Amino acid sequence: MDGTIKEALSVVSDDQSLFDSAYGASSHLSKADMTASANPDYGQPHKINPIPPQQDWINQPMRVNIKREYEHMNGSRESPVDCSINKCSKLIGGSEGNAMTYTYMDEKNGPPPPNMTTNERRVIVPADPALWSQDHVRQWLEWAIKEYGLVEIDCSLFQNIDGKELCKMSKEDFLRSTSIYNTEVLLSHLNYLRDSSSSLGYNTQAHTDQSSRLTAKEDPSYEAVRRSGWGNSMSSPVTKSPPMGGTQNVNKSGDQQRSQPDPYQILGPTSSRLANPGSGQIQLWQFLLELLSDSSNASCITWEGTNGEFKMTDPDEVARRWGERKSKPNMNYDKLSRALRYYYDKSIMTKVHGKRYAYKFDFHGIAQALQPHPTDTSMYKYPSEFSYMPSYHSHQQKVNFVPSHPSSMPVTSSGFFGATSPYWNSPSANIYPNPNVPRHPNTHVQSHLGGFY
């Protein structure tokens, strides 16, 4: 009876161990003792207890315990899975906008197993190798040695080399310091970093060294050069010449001069057209425009801008040339300036106040002066061309032209001169024997006009 109960308990205990994962290694010893005290007819105890499945069931809880013990020992709650051992983690970010983070192990007592976490060291360098300092180059070499397992590299040969010099080194320069295998690895990774920084649009001017920044910012035109993108070198503060497509100039005064158009190109054709007097005689203002239309006369007269203002740089020479044109050898600037005042009232030109020998053309006034004015044709017409004037002697017709008094002046047949003059053949004769002369109706011109003569 006692043997049957023990056998049943042994079977139940063994079945529970298959499904209950809370049973640990300490419970197996008691189970084995219970089985050993049972009837030996059931065979060996290890054949009844499924020990291999129990090992599989308890494997995972043991791993969790290992992680927790590690966290407790180091005082950190970071999971060891977050740390990479075999490969470096490259991160873009950090304190600077573009930086690479390299992670490698500190080997103290030999290389650790690949499934265990060790203390790691991070190296943060700029993304562009050309901006590396000497310390960055050294850290990069140390990382490459740890990462790729490189040997036979003398780091002392790279002590005084910064990022610029490193990028300029050729394959032969690397071969002088290390083997061909190490050279291929280092150059491949260096080229990869350079290509990555260029694809990210990395701005090399933003990370120049402090000395070059101070030197460049002392010049006030540095900002204009940097913003316009004309700075081709990181160390040179000012470029000598901007590109063809540039829209800003380094020198502000030069920018203003280049922005103003050439007055001779703008006012030259207008000056030549207005200076042409045609068939008539040339006037003084036209002569001045003739001189201003040619830039070779700038030694004596020149434009001041494009608004019509000009200045006589040599007024005596201008007066002498005007005297030669008009055949007046005694011409001087005083006489010429008095002649110019005549054009003030005609709105052809004005005197620029505050400037000596400076005048200004009024092209609107010149256009008004050159327009043909409509003349009164009545001043040039004969009286016979008007409908209300019948003859050349209008004063005789006005004597009897009284619209308010329809009755005519009573006269005798003998006329004003008494007896008939022998010069007149008939009383009806008049001074206009031609019948084609236009006459007004009889109400205005009486038929007795012939009796007056």
Curated annotation (Swiss-Prot):
Biased composition (Polar residues): 201-214, 230-239, 246-273
GO cellular component: nucleus
CDD domains named among the record's database cross-references: SAM_PNT-FLI-1
Biological process annotations from GO: cell differentiation; regulation of transcription by RNA polymerase II
SUPFAM superfamilies the UniProt entry points to: SAM/Pointed domain, Winged helix' DNA-binding domain
Keywords for the protein's UniProt record, in alphabetical order: Activator, DNA-binding, Nucleus, Transcription, Transcription regulation
Record's compositionally biased regions (Basic and acidic residues): 215-226
Primary site of residence: nucleus
Localization: Nucleus
Occurrences of domain PNT (ranges): 111-197
Keyword set includes Nucleus: yes
Annotated region of DNA binding: 282-362
Family: Belongs to the ETS family.
Annotated protein name in UniProt: Retroviral integration site protein Fli-1 homolog
Organism: Xenopus laevis
Top-level taxonomy: Eukaryota, Metazoa, Chordata, Craniata, Vertebrata
